[in-house]
């Protein structure tokens, strides 16, 4: 089976978040199931710099008013189709924002162009290769099924994955003519959304199947609390909505072989983690003692619950814990966490930028990782924690709820607990979880058992890929 995957970012070429990890890992995980994937991605400067010896596959002289070329290249085991369109993607900032952190004003055109290019490939314009199915990801490629619906193309099934429904790609109605869609596409059944153009909304309406990245999130987005205004549209498609938990690359996140950590180890040699712990202590300027180190590796945003973390930081220190925080985001939240570090020197350390090697070292050296998200479609950080023996302390929501077994009495008795869940997502809720963690940490036998149980968890892409392959086969066999 041939699948075209379309995404605005893919690891290892370009990454701003978990979307890139998922879209990069899935094609490799699907290979054993006979799925051949080509992944279409914008030709950002970082992408163009990273690829070697690309082959020109298709010229698009008028892609929404600009010239573009589709290049093909193999990189890190993935077959990439790179949309080389300098007018859209050759920018000095990031994939979505300029150097000052503001959205590019033409983001609607940049990602409509990506979607239209995907629809052109779906229609068979790429010489010698035509997909059996198209898989789009988030709002940036959600117009792929829209263009497939409204342009006269051969009928192909399409899948749209909602990685985070909070990001919807909503723009003023004045951009509609620039999309070059027929007039009737601007309707309730199409991309019209309360008088605006809704990229994600249009994709939800037109894709043949919808997936989210965990079963709990699939249920949550049917409710007003989590549906972000789109719960009605999703409910109308609920019969074709599937929650499939993400996996992680178990080779990259393998503490026995990880080149990014100071000392490798396994579930049988957990004492070796002490060397990694010492490096974390040095890097974050923490005091060296026997108390637990709680880490945070996250965007510093309200969604991720970082305001709650800032509120409880002093109390965690007074309990005897230490905090190592890695990430950047909202300026006010960054300021609050840096202020906590200033008040509690040696007990709270903050590094205000993401650093992939450091994130590996933190998971390999810290005792637990705090993930107090208000909503979390799937989450990957807790899976990295399981793999590394860094116990996740998570809000009971979305994929966090699906992947972590809470250390309640029954789970501890059965020796199946892998972390701590808490609700509600408030400062007091998090504090109660931290108190439980401090109590459990005192019994090193129980703590070690939980570490080993987490490290045994199957967090690879195996079962998830099997479910995606089954969904693909079902859609292709019944036709669009």
UniProtKB/Swiss-Prot annotation:
Catalytic activity: [(1->4)-alpha-D-glucosyl](n) + ADP-alpha-D-glucose = [(1->4)-alpha-D-glucosyl](n+1) + ADP + H(+)
Pathway: Glycan biosynthesis; glycogen biosynthesis
EC code(s) of this entry: 2.4.1.21
One GO CC term, this protein: cytosol
UniProt keyword terms in alphabetical order: Glycogen biosynthesis, Glycosyltransferase, Transferase
GO biological process: glycogen biosynthetic process
GO molecular function, one term: alpha-1,4-glucan glucosyltransferase (ADP-glucose donor) activity
Residues the entry annotates as binding ADP-alpha-D-glucose: 15
InterPro entries linked to this entry: Glyco_trans_1, GS/SS, Starch_synth_cat_dom
Gene3D superfamilies reported for this sequence: Glycogen Phosphorylase B
Function of the protein: Synthesizes alpha-1,4-glucan chains using ADP-glucose.
Family: Belongs to the glycosyltransferase 1 family. Bacterial/plant glycogen synthase subfamily.
NCBIfam families listed in its UniProt record: glgA, PRK00654.1-2
Record protein name field: Glycogen synthase
Species in which this protein is naturally found: Rhizobium tropici
Gene: glgA
């Amino acid at each position: 089976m041939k699948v075209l995957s379309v995404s605005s970012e893919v690891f290892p070429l370009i990454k701003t978040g978990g979307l890139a990890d998922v879209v990069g890992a899935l094609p490799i995980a699907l290979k054993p199931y006979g799925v051949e994937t080509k992944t279409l991605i914008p030709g950002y400067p970082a992408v163009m710099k990273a690829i070697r010896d690309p082959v020109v596959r298709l010229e698009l002289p008028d892609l929404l008013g600009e010239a573009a070329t589709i290049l093909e290249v193999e990189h890190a085991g993935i077959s990439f189709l790179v949309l080389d369109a300098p007018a859209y993607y050759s920018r000095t900032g990031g994939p979505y924002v300029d150097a000052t952190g503001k959205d590019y004003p033409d983001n609607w055109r940049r990602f409509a162009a990506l979607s239209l290019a995907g629809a052109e490939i779906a229609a068979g314009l790429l010489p010698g290769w035509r997909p059996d199915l198209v898989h789009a990801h988030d709002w940036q490629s959600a117009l792929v099924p829209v263009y497939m619906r409204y342009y006269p193309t051969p009928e192909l099934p399409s899948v749209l994955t909602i990685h985070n429904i909070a990001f919807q790609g909503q723009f003023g109605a004045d951009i509609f003519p620039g999309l070059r869609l027929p007039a009737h596409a601007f309707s309730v059944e199409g991309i019209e959304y309360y008088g605006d153009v809704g990229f994600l909304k249009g994709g939800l309406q037109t894709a043949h199947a919808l997936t989210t990245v965990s079963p709990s999130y699939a249920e949550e987005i049917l409710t007003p609390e989590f549906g972000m205004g789109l719960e009605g549209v999703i409910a109308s498609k609920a019969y074709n909505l599937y929650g499939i938990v993400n996996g992680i690359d178990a080779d990259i996140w393998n503490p026995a072989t990880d080149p990014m950590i100071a000392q490798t180890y396994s579930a049988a040699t957990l004492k070796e983690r002490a060397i990694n712990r010492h490096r974390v202590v040095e890097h974050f300027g923490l005091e060296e003692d026997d108390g637990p180190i709680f880490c945070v590796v996250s965007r510093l945003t309200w969604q991720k619950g970082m305001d709650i973390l800032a509120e409880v930081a002093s109390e965690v220190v007074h309990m005897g814990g230490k905090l190592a925080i890695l990430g950047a985001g909202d300026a006010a939240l960054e300021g609050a966490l840096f202020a906590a570090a200033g008040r509690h020197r040696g007990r709270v350390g903050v590094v205000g930028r993401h650093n992939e090697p450091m994130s590996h070292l933190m998971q390999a050296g810290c005792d637990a990782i705090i993930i107090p998200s208000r909503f979390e479609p799937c989450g990957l950080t807790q899976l990295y924690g399981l793999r590394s023996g860094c116990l996740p302390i998570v809000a009971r929501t979305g994929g966090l709820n699906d992947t972590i077994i809470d250390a309640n009495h029954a789970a501890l008795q059965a020796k199946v607990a892998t972390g701590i869940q808490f609700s509600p997502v408030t400062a007091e809720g998090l504090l109660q979880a931290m108190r439980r963690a401090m109590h459990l940490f005192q019994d090193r036998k129980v703590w070690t058992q939980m570490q080993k149980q987490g490290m045994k968890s199957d967090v690879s892409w195996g079962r998830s890929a099997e479910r995606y392959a089954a969904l693909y086969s079902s859609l292709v066999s019944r036709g669009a």
